[in-house]
Amino acid sequence: MKVDVIKLDGKKAGSVDLDEALFGLEPRADILHRVVRWQRNNAQAGTHKVKTRREVSYSTKKIYRQKGTGGARHGARSAPIFRGGGVYKGPTPRSHGHELTKKFRKLGLRHALSAKAAEGRLVVIESIAMDEAKTSALAKQVKEMGWKRALIIDGSDVDANFAQAARNIEGLDVLPTMGANVYDILKRDTLVITKAGVEALEARLK
C-alpha cells in the first residue's frame, strides 16, 4: 500500500510503499486484546498484601473464659471474625504476568499497525531530526499538524534533539523501533512513523 510521506513542517516529501503484511491486515480485536492484557499484567506490581492471623499484633491469650458468659466461645483476639483481626485468604505478593509466545506478540504488533492504517490515523514522516532542541518550536508544529495524542516511532535510535524537545509536550510519546508495542500504539490517537522506523519495523516483524 502506498502512503504519502511528509516533512516535519507538514510539506509533502514523496511517498512510500508499506508492506501489506504489516499495515494491510484486517485488525482482529481478540488478538489485540490478548496482547494488551499480557502487557498490562506484566506491568502490574503485584505488591498487594494483608496481614494474616499470625501476623497481626495481638496477644494469643483467650479473650474471656469458655463458659458462663452467655456469649459465643472465642479464643484469640486475632481471629478473622473480629475487627482488626487477621484476614483469611487475603491477597499476597505475586506476579500477575503470564506467558505469550514471541510469534503471537509479533502478530499483535502487525494488527496494531494495521488498525491505525485502517482508521486513517497512520502518518509517515521523512525524518524527525532537529537542529536544536526547542520545545516551543516543536509544540507549534505539532499543533499545526493536529497531533493532540500521538506516538512517534523513529528508527533504531531517536534523534536526541527531538527527544529532548518532545519530552515536555503533553500527549506526545517518542519511542525507538524496538520500543514499539501494541498498548502504546492503541493508546494514542495518531501513529507517526519515520521512514527509518518503517524500514526497521519491517525488518523486525519479518
From Swiss-Prot:
A GO biological-process term: translation
Keyword terms of this UniProt record: Ribonucleoprotein, Ribosomal protein, RNA-binding, rRNA-binding
Keyword Nucleus tagged: no
Family matches, as SUPFAM superfamilies: Ribosomal protein L4
Single GO molecular function: structural constituent of ribosome
Top-level taxon in the UniProt lineage: Bacteria
GO-annotated cellular components: ribonucleoprotein complex; ribosome
InterPro entries in alphabetical order: Ribosomal_uL4, Ribosomal_uL4-like, Ribosomal_uL4_dom_sf
Matching PANTHER family: 50S RIBOSOMAL PROTEIN L4, LARGE RIBOSOMAL SUBUNIT PROTEIN UL4M
Quaternary structure and interacting proteins, as annotated: Part of the 50S ribosomal subunit.
Described function: One of the primary rRNA binding proteins, this protein initially binds near the 5'-end of the 23S rRNA. It is important during the early stages of 50S assembly. It makes multiple contacts with different domains of the 23S rRNA in the assembled 50S subunit and ribosome. Forms part of the polypeptide exit tunnel.
Family statement drawn from the similarity comment of this UniProt entry: Belongs to the universal ribosomal protein uL4 family.
Protein name in the entry: Large ribosomal subunit protein uL4
Native organism: Jannaschia sp. (strain CCS1)
Gene that this sequence comes from: rplD
